[in-house]
């Protein structure tokens, strides 16, 4: 990110130096809260299977530190973001399968950072979304890819009523779900204190990394 005029020449030269075409593209910085949205598309319908607040820190490097569901954004802005996502999916010609968006709500309204024909990576589609909605969207995506109807999704989803290029539905969040990343400092982890006590907290759903940490620290 170029923060002021003094960084412009250096940044452009660095970009060109590392470009095969020896060109660079300058794009507007989109300022505003960011969201991750997952959806499944088939038979003229688009079902939102997850909508999470995305937590980005440490500019100008923009490190993703986690997600939280359900979102805190207002319903009107929520609908605007979903409609923009649906228009992007339509423009890309995605008619069957998964779609995901990283999208911001700026002073000019929704602005798309990315739309991809896949589910969210990391822990999102496998853990964070299902923990919030009690819905296995990975299974539903596979069913659609195999030409089958995602019956569980059809039972859980509810229709959204606003103008969009698809018949819109959503699978709503039932519980709060969040995942967070830890940024380490230089050095070697020798011990972790209080881990056993924290893991007995009823609000902790998954502890894979905690088990791994105990193994590492015991070596």
Named regions from a protein language model:
Residues 7:
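Residue-level recognition of oxygen-bearing side chains
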